[in-house]
């Protein structure tokens, strides 16, 4: 299916690009989240009219994301989890737990934006984590997992 992108999408293209994607990806992800539209003649003409408005909106989103990225930069987030004597956690700290902790601090971050380089955190201590606030803004934070005695 050919679609026209209404915003920048990672590994796909920028605002206004006409790209071919699999039907399921377009129908189930891009179109419902208003990241793209089908590339019909009417949609392309409508996009040409609204392009300046969409570019302004994209610039505002980027500016807001950069402001959040500056606040998040070099942040140390402390998460408590039950652990054994050797520091191994009972369970793990996932991207969902980190997103919830960030929401408690006042940030609106989705769990899919939290990138754990080595998978879920299973040891107490400091762990570097990347948070993708926007496709162009990635903030590096440190997660300090504090082991609580069970």
Swiss-Prot record:
| Gene3D superfamilies hit by this protein | Ribosomal protein L9, C-terminal domain, Ribosomal protein L9, N-terminal domain
Q: Which UniProt keywords apply?
A: Ribonucleoprotein, Ribosomal protein, RNA-binding, rRNA-binding
Q: Which GO terms describe its molecular function?
A: rRNA binding; structural constituent of ribosome
| InterPro entries membership | Ribosomal_bL9, Ribosomal_bL9/RNase_H1_N, Ribosomal_bL9_bac/chp, Ribosomal_bL9_C, Ribosomal_bL9_C_sf, Ribosomal_bL9_N, Ribosomal_bL9_N_sf
Annotated GO biological processes are: translation
Q: Does the keyword Plastid apply?
A: no
User: Is Ribonucleoprotein found in the keyword set?
Assistant: yes
Q: Which residues form the signal peptide?
A: none
Q: Which GO terms describe its cellular component?
A: ribonucleoprotein complex; ribosome
Function according to Swiss-Prot or TrEMBL: Binds to the 23S rRNA.
Cite the HAMAP family for this sequence: Ribosomal_bL9 (MF_00503)
Name the family.
Belongs to the bacterial ribosomal protein bL9 family.
Q: Which NCBIfam families match?
A: L9
Protein name according to UniProt: Large ribosomal subunit protein bL9
Task: State the organism of origin.
Answer: Polynucleobacter necessarius subsp. necessarius (strain STIR1)
């Amino acid at each position: 299916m050919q679609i026209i992108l209404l915003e920048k999408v990672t590994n796909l293209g920028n605002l206004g690009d006409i790209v071919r994607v699999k039907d399921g990806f377009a129908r189930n992800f891009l179109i419902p989240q208003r990241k793209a539209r089908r590339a019909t003649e009417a949609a392309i003409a409508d996009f040409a009219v609204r392009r300046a408005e969409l570019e302004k909106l994209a610039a505002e989103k980027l500016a807001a994301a950069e402001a959040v990225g500056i606040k998040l930069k070099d942040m140390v987030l402390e998460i408590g989890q039950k652990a054994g004597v050797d520091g191994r956690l009972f369970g793990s700290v996932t991207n969902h737990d980190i997103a919830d902790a960030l929401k408690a601090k006042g940030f609106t971050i989705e769990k899919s934006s939290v990138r754990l380089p080595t998978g879920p955190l299973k040891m107490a201590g400091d762990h570097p984590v990347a948070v993708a606030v926007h496709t162009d803004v990635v903030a590096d934070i440190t997660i300090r997992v504090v082991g609580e005695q069970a």
